[in-house]
Amino acid sequence: MSKTYWSQRIEELANSEKAVPDAVFFTSEAYRNYTETAAKDMITGVCGYLRRYGYSISEMEEDRRVNALTVEMLRNPEITAYTDGYNICIGTNNSLVTLLDSRELRHYAIQGFRVHEVAHILFTDFPTLKNWAEHLSQGIWWPKIPDRASEKDGAELTKRLKNPGFCKPFVSIAHSIENALEDGFIEREIQEMYGGLATTELATLDEVQISESVSFGEMLKKKCSPFEAMLNQILLYAKYDITMDDG
């Protein structure tokens, strides 16, 4: 089916808002296809942009990525969005969506998840990250030994990585920090290369996230762990160049 067809179907559903609740609208096959088509168009657009600037991305590689991509819409309120590099799952009922007071804004937020996850598909090096995590899980620095690993504290950390009881939570923490930094990187890249409506969609989602964020101290008062509170500040800084202080 053409992109025009799915856009028309979405408009028909949107115009019947009173008769079609969000639970039906955002998980309908028409909406899923609209979202998947938009995701594939993004990949095509960015690949074309990079080729124009001399990057070696073949049309065969572009087609492979586009044809492999699938999108799934989920109603689980605990799910925001995620991707494995090929498939995108988007939560349509999480708090970053439901906090918004109109269907149009909720639509923009959901599509903001699509923009974010496509950015991961385009700019995150999944094979390298997998290798890094697998080596670290075995207590091995990869792809190279850190510069300060030979110093006293570095040598002690390297030794402790051989202890599975220490290594497992260390890898989990390292992965969480890496993902926060990666989120900042991929959002900057996609906004640079694919502006327009996609930027508006991503901004809608980001504004909700900022508005719901609190300071390190406020998170501790809510009984969050110190690491969770710290990670939230890292994410805010990586994505938006801000932190929430307690002043």
What are these regions (language model features)?
Residues L236-G247:
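Negatively charged
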Residues E228-L235:
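Amphipathic alpha-helical elements of HEAT/ARM-like alpha-solenoid repeat scaffolds that form extended
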Residues M1-K222, Y237-A238:
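Basic/hydrophobic alpha-helical interface regions
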